[in-house]
């Protein structure tokens, strides 16, 4: 598989606190890569650096061989990078349809696209996530699960090559979580996207991820298949705990 994203020795500090320390890894086209670690491990900082919301102190990020380290978030979106947020960030005064259409205008194939065309395209993404019947409802009036799905529709509408998913299972009941897992799997297959998935629900990554990267204190603890990572002693000690049932 071709290399899609390459992270080279990135470091990020906040005052005297080292949030990310000389971290390197790669993501290849077509993969689902899980990203785990205890609270405060630096996961959110890594995602914010990779998506352009924070600047790394040192190191380099490449996408498709292009150095994107200094690019703004909108420039990275044009390169094909999209993300969801752990806490949904809707446009509260826009309808679900207008919210997705607005995001569609930010993607990598949107030069000179009209808002009317974006609205038409947005209907397809709302149908995909099961929100077509809610298209005329303001985002502020959607349920929490519906906001999660709206967030996914908005990210897909940018036609990403690489999608960062940030703890999409948080706050969902078992039925909603199952629907979300199946929907993400369908999105990967139907739209040909690569996924970098930050998640605390390990059972989800055991089912969905091709590889998992574990970090703690901003440094890589382990990297490998889900089975290899959950059986790694450093990961068990720092994150999973001794009560975790290892996979043979």
How should each PLM-predicted stretch be described?
Residues 2-248:
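Glycine-rich phosphate-binding loops of nucleotide-dependent enzymes
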